[in-house]
Amino acid sequence: MQLNSTEISDLIKQRIEKFNVASEARNEGTIVSVSDGIIRIHGLADVMQGEMIELPGGHYALALNLERDSVGAVVMGPYADLQEGMKVTGTGRILEVPVGPEMLGRVVNTLGEPIDGKGPIDAKLTSPVEVIAPGVIDRKSVDQPLQTGYKSVDSMIPIGRGQRELIIGDRQTGKTAMAIDAIINQKNSGIFAIYVAIGQKASTIANVVRKLEEHGALANTIVVVASASESAALQYLAPYAGCAMGEYFRDRGEDALIVYDDLSKQAVAYRQISLLLKRPPGREAFPGDVFYLHSRLLERAARVSVAYVEKFTNGEVKGKTGSLTALPIIETQAGDVSAFVPTNVISITDGQIFLQTELFTAGVRPAVDPGISVSRVGGAAQTKIIKKLSGGIRTALAQYRELAAFAQFSSDLDEATKKQLDHGEKVTELMKQKQYAPMSVFDQALVIFTAEKGYLNDVELKKLADFEEALLSYARGQFADLAKEIDSSGAWNKEIEDQFVKLVEDFKATQTW
């Protein structure tokens, strides 16, 4: 048989052309140990800090420890089925969560997946959970108020848009209640809200969601949940995920409010992860970077400039500043604010609202201690009318506390002292407020006006609550235009003062309570 070399070469060429090898470059490693949600991986040479690692079964782990011959990663999900020898793959991606207006009104987990049974979320965009905070040049000073609806807070410890105001106190002092009321008060203000629940019971979170829905505030709120039954990794990441969702609004010239409830539990989750990763422990067994854990989170709350918003949106949004206001919550043990995490967060934030157990049990709710509560930047943002009227409130309360302690030892007090005690007692009573009943600017201004101008001198202490309720009802009915004007402008002048005088005097002359 004669072999034709040309035919053979053509045949070989055809075979080579048809031969197809599908190949993909993958960064693959092997699990060498699994314990308590922490896996050690050998062979992932090019992995990044914070990279998502794909595990068998569709779950992911987060690379946190990059060591010479292995990678320590924390599993974001169930880890019972993971075994030594299993293959894992580096994704080359940092953890991202869905963001955008589609998230509003929904309850999601740390990864942005819906857990409220209302179907999938069609979010168009995602954002990394870890983002560098805006620089000094990109920021604008805080000068717009964020009304919490609490008389005691808005008058003595005002909060501005873009501020970080810590709510601190022992367990069962009304910290969550204050934050939820602040969210409810934003329902008609155009401010979006994000509530991040960290390490709480699922029943407690369900109750919060129900209350937000009842008061019409859930529609402009995103609830991010990492409950007590979730892994430490998800509890540690939840605040960053919520912050990324809030930054979407900030960077597009909108205003947003984020509540972290609470950062003590996040610090404990991070301590657990760090100890399991064998990082050296420091004070109270926390790792050395626990300050950075909170500072990099809270620095992302800011008021950003017009130029920043224009640059971020490529000129689509013009002439608007955006803001993200943070209300972190810290739980203290027996009132000890000098513990490690509380002192860290106090030094990072722009002020703190201190809630006292003694005041709470005495029926003063919200249990705000005006002596050690402070707002370092909110004064510039306070509504003009509240600023003008509330100057004497803090002084009256401070003098009352001082005199009340002195009066316990002395029976014969002069008239001036008795007057001061009576006034302080009434101001304390006036600062009390029911839960889920945030007050408008007009309502707050009117109540403070009656105290400051001496209209309460002839009102009995036990009838003060009835007096306040009747006065506000009368004012909303008879002076509706004035109420509307003050709620929208917050202005204060001689004309408004005269109308306030007329309102209160007419009420006292014609009404009963």
Curated annotation (Swiss-Prot):
F-type ATPases have 2 components, CF(1) - the catalytic core - and CF(0) - the membrane proton channel. CF(1) has five subunits: alpha(3), beta(3), gamma(1), delta(1), epsilon(1). CF(0) has three main subunits: a(1), b(2) and c(9-12). The alpha and beta chains form an alternating ring which encloses part of the gamma chain. CF(1) is attached to CF(0) by a central stalk formed by the gamma and epsilon chains, while a peripheral stalk is formed by the delta and b chains. The keyword rRNA-binding does not apply. One of its GO terms (cellular component) is proton-transporting ATP synthase complex. ATP binds at G169, D170, R171, Q172, T173, G174, K175, T176. It is a peripheral membrane protein. It catalyses: ATP + H2O + 4 H(+)(in) = ADP + phosphate + 5 H(+)(out). It is found in: Cell inner membrane. Produces ATP from ADP in the presence of a proton gradient across the membrane. The alpha chain is a regulatory subunit. PANTHER family: ATP SYNTHASE SUBUNIT ALPHA, MITOCHONDRIAL. InterPro entries: ATP_synth_asu-like_sf, ATP_synth_asu_C, ATP_synth_asu_C_sf, ATP_synth_F1_a_nt-bd_dom, ATP_synth_F1_asu, ATPase_a/bsu_AS, ATPase_F1/V1/A1_a/bsu_N, ATPase_F1/V1/A1_a/bsu_N_sf. It is an enzyme of class 7 (translocase). The gene is atpA. This is ATP synthase subunit alpha. Its EC number is 7.1.2.2. SUPFAM superfamilies: C-terminal domain of alpha and beta subunits of F1 ATP synthase, N-terminal domain of alpha and beta subunits of F1 ATP synthase, P-loop containing nucleoside triphosphate hydrolases.
